[in-house]
Amino acid sequence: MNKIVKNAFILTAITVIAGLLLGVVYGVTKEPIANAKANSKQEAFQSVLSDADSFETVDDLDTDAASELLKSNGYSSDAIEEVALGKDKSGETIGYVINVVSHEGYGGDIEISVGIQADGTVKGIEMLSISETAGLGMKADTDDFKNQFRDKKVEKFQYTKTGAASEDEIDAIS
């Protein structure tokens, strides 16, 4: 009986020590990870809407209305996570950055940042998070793919596998 109690005490002590160490490591790395993520997001914002001098997050975003808008356009598994206003030096809004999460990624969620000028021109897209398979899936994060969206002003993009022939067509990954 003493041996069982002794072993239980040793295992409990090891578990408590490991838990405390894990908590300390989490506490030490939490802020640097959050800062790195915020910096990465700011870099993506600047990349997709380079004319903006500053960005202001829209705090009162109606996520339900945004989800309905996406669903009505055939994007039922996507969600708008964040919208930021891109402002020039005088504080005027010159465009928007929209962060969208697609839940249809093969390797997990795909987070995309899209920059749109006030006149509706897509200035660029940037992948915030993508965990697709090496090769085909990761082609979405190449400049060749992302540059197809740059400076396009269309109502809706069409995807083609035969090569983009018009302004509203994007060469699909295949």
Short names for language-model regions:
Residues 2-174:
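Flexible, solvent-exposed loop/hinge segments and secondary-structure transition points
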